[in-house]
């Protein structure tokens, strides 16, 4: 089961450099509750951004897969994968795709569930989520707060 989780504004903005363009505590809690201790897939830039945020503390995930084109890359606390298509096609267990933009784009064709936090308003940044063909998914859950509409889409 391949799950993708992200927050985006109404223009599909998801990032500003290596940062999230907003700080919404409830959304961070939601993300942590879904991904803590889970097997995750992320890109190399996202990995280094999170390592910078957590500093000497370990990342709050179970097994960490990092997608990279660098075949020489070795990471102490993660498994490096160089062929994301083969990895996603063959992966059979629960997996959470947690970013960034390129990894989301490459993972979307394989995703069974989309956990999307729609952040209200427009923000400034430079990283966008690709277009989604929502006809391939059913909206099965949503909850709205003042700042965010949380949704779950499941593949038809």
Q: Model-predicted segments: where are they?
A:
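Enzymes that bind and transform nitrogen-containing heteroaromatic metabolites
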Residues: 1-156
